[in-house]
Amino acid sequence: MKFNDFLDDLVNYEAGKPIELVVREFGIDAKDVIKLASNENPFGTSKRVEEALKEVAKNAHLYPDDSYFELKEGLAKKFGVTSKKLIIGSGSDQIIEFALHAKANRQSGVLMAGVTFAMYEIYAKQTGAKIYRTKSVEHNLSEFLEIYNAHKDEISVIFLCLPNNPLGECIDADEVYKFIKNIDENTLVVLDCAYNEFAKFKDSKKEIKPSEVVKFKNAIYLGTFSKAYALGGMRVGYGVANEEIIGALSKLRAPFNITTPSLRAAIVALGDDEFVQKTMQNNFEQMKRYEDFAEQNGIEFIPSYTNFITFKFNEPKSSQICEKMLKKGIILRDLKSYALNAVRITIGQAWQNDRVFEELEQILK
């Protein structure tokens, strides 16, 4: 069978290994497996959301309110914007896909950092667009601008992942706003802020505000309920932009693109500030332990504004480290697919991190 040509160039996105795989392959009891590979919230779903899901299960036979009125109103109030400046997606990934299908094509280019979220390239290639990357693996706005100015007539979409996944670095928000002002109004700047809650907690200067983003004619802010709000399995994301951008992307959204349980979970999670605060407090207390461990063991790391930390290695190979840890029942994220000898580790609870340090120290001896 003949398929579209762009598929020849595409690779499958490599998701973090599931707990079930470790149970099957290594015979380890599920309760003894620690998954720190996919940047999920280590505290699991909040109690308030759990109770809401039990209640909403009775209505699983009903389609959700496709206007997502209550969720949009909650987000609008939180961010100081109107609900008309919001779009809801099945994860923020879906809105990335909308943005590219709205703006990119075979005659255009898409610009991103040297190492960043893999789905940008995967979705961009579906449109036939040319991929431009900075030479710097981390975000360097001067280099972004240099490449953009050299290919201004071609580049239709720019992705800034702030904080950046899978490395964790971030840039001051004021620098980001200045950058957008240097970009032509017909080029869409996508600000993927999936970890913005973490960046804001660590350093308020890194907080990108949706209320500022909507002032630009050519920018969209993306957020998610997967990380700080612990709803990775619910798949709820959102975009915030001016009404022209939201109107265009909404034409690509199928009806009922999130589920009735997902919608209720997101509405309840949005109001659970206590849970989010607990998440942030634990994250950066435990992050300090990882930084101390790295320094004590001569491991290079990237200062992180997220819920993960990336360790860079000379020896041994990251794939060897991850495989040995996997056999111990600890799932980490090998970054060899990004051409890095590095391991990304989600910040867990204290007891989970204790096991990581114990096992990793043995491997590195």
UniProtKB/Swiss-Prot annotation:
SUPFAM superfamilies: PLP-dependent transferases. Its cofactor is pyridoxal 5'-phosphate. The gene is hisC. One of its GO terms (molecular function) is histidinol-phosphate transaminase activity. The modification N6-(pyridoxal phosphate)lysine is found at residue 227. Belongs to the class-II pyridoxal-phosphate-dependent aminotransferase family. Histidinol-phosphate aminotransferase subfamily. Disulfide bonds: none annotated. This is Histidinol-phosphate aminotransferase. It comes from the Bacteria. It comes from Campylobacter concisus (strain 13826).
